[in-house]
Amino acid sequence: MTKFLLAVGSGGFVGSILRFLIFKYFENPQTTGWPWGTFTVNILGSLLAGILFGISEKTNLIPETLSLFLLVGFCGGFTTFSAFALDNLKLFQAGAFMQNFLYISATILLGVLAIFIGHFLATSVLK
């Protein structure tokens, strides 16, 4: 059990740091009008989760500990629904209702599409 906890924790550590760096790369959403950092990590994280899940479904290439590190730890630390929710609150409070609606719609649609694409790519390559 300890090795699983360490795998999840260290994956979360790495994912959170990468998320922070991506947030820093993009401008402040209050100046651009769009929370690019959160949007980017959620779409990329969904794509990666789809790829990893597809590989796990078709092969035994990813041991359980590595799967926990990548899917639960890294993807969990990298993507962030709470930041997505907070971005929406800020857009709403700023009166940016159309941007708020577009951000919610685009994140959900592209996030789900990205996980399907990632899964398709992984399972197609591994046939």
Q: Where in this protein do the model-derived segments appear?
A:
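Membrane-interface helix-loop junctions in multi-pass transporters/channels
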Residues: 1-127
